[in-house]
Design a protein with these regions (language model features):
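Cytoplasmic membrane-interface "Motif A"-like loop-to-helix N-cap segments
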Residues: 80-92, 315-328
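Central cavity-lining transmembrane alpha-helices of secondary-active solute carriers
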Residues: 60-77, 297-310
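Extracytoplasmic gate region of multi-pass secondary transporters
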Residues: 37-41, 253-304
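Extracytoplasmic
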Residues: 18-52, 273-278
């Protein structure tokens, strides 16, 4: 009985994997919206009269605040200072607000010629919503990583991270595959007999999913509070305290910069392609727009399968540097 009282909440495998499912689902919802506009590019040009410059401006918005306003760095500091519950809920609300603004922009007909910052009013507002969402989803990502460390430290941590990332990538695949069918399903035929796709419909679907994902994270916060109580009972700190000297240690660590460089090269090689991949299938290979997203939608399948596999392997044998080299060669 004494042993049972001393057992921490994260010693329960059922609870560990349950909370992982909750936060991983939240990330799946976020990744769905991240790439939902990619298959819609040809329709944006046809229905809303966007051009490639408008779309490029919009899709670049994801990094505006994260890069130029250093929001990810500030988000990390807030996470260390305020904890996963406060930061995670804040990130979820940012995602919902950003998606809501994006939906408003895409679903609203603005006066012809209305401009803001040199671009169409609709494009600028959609980009602003996407930029706000980008802050939320990236901060949510680092929050979920810290949650996994908190619950799985000394256990199946790499496998848990791999499964979380695989679940999030399911969101990417769903965005590429389901977006156009959703837009067509809710489309309409005008008085002249011409069919129009309903571009706002997939974004509204994302907004609903993000609300559900936020509820899932809210449910998680109760488990997190109980975990903190069980750690307090053991005399352990629920989370490591933030220290300013940690920042100095990170920026002077050569290993950190090497890993960061690898991530930059990976992101610059893969993710911009996904934004234009569906349109590339249509323009260059004349693929039916209804199916164009399915082809790049296959890209994350490898990550969905292999990321948990390599995570489990890392838990068993270590050798993280070797696995990173293998991953780089595969890329």
């Amino acid at each position: 009985m004494t042993e049972q009282l001393k057992q921490k909440l994260n010693d329960s495998a059922v609870l560990r994997w349950s909370v992982l499912a909750l936060v991983a689902f939240t990330m799946l919802c976020g990744y769905f919206l991240t790439d939902v506009m990619s298959p819609l590019k040809p329709m944006l040009e046809k229905e809303l009269l966007w051009d490639s410059l408008d779309y490029g401006f919009f899709t670049s918005a994801y990094g505006w605040f994260n890069v130029f306003l250093l929001m990810l760095i500030f988000g990390g500091i807030i996470l260390d200072k305020m904890g996963v519950r406060f930061t995670g809920m804040g990130a979820c609300l940012l995602m919902v607000f950003g998606c809501g603004l994006k939906y408003y922009a895409i679903s609203t007909t603005f006066p012809e010629g209305a401009m803001l910052f040199g671009f169409k009013m609709q494009v600028t507002l959609a980009a602003l919503g996407y930029a706000i969402f980008g802050v939320g989803v990236e901060i949510a990502g680092i929050t979920v990583s810290k949650i996994i460390v908190k619950w799985f430290k000394g256990k199946e941590m790499a496998l848990a991270m791999g499964l979380e990332m695989a679940t999030a990538r399911i969101g990417t695949t769903l965005a590429m595959v389901l977006t156009v069918p959703l837009a067509d399903f809710f489309g309409y035929t005008d008085e002249g007999g011409a069919f129009h796709t309903n571009i706002p419909a997939p974004i509204l679907f994302c907004l609903v999913m993000l609300c559900v994902g936020t509820i899932a994270f809210f449910i998680y916060t109760f488990y997190d509070k109980k975990l903190d109580a069980s750690l307090d009972a053991e005399g352990l700190e629920p989370e490591e305290p933030f220290r300013m000297k940690d920042i100095v240690y990170i920026i002077t660590n050569k290993g950190f910069w090497l890993i960061a460089l690898l991530c930059v090269l990976f992101y610059s090689a893969v993710f911009p392609f996904i934004k234009y991949a569906a349109d590339l299938m249509v323009q260059k290979y004349h693929v039916d727009p209804k199916l164009a997203g399915t082809i790049p939608g296959l890209l994350p399948i490898g990550a969905i399968i292999l990321t948990p596999l390599f995570g489990s392997l890392y838990d068993r044998i270590g050798k993280g540097a070797t696995l990173m080299v293998i991953g780089s060669v595969m890329l």
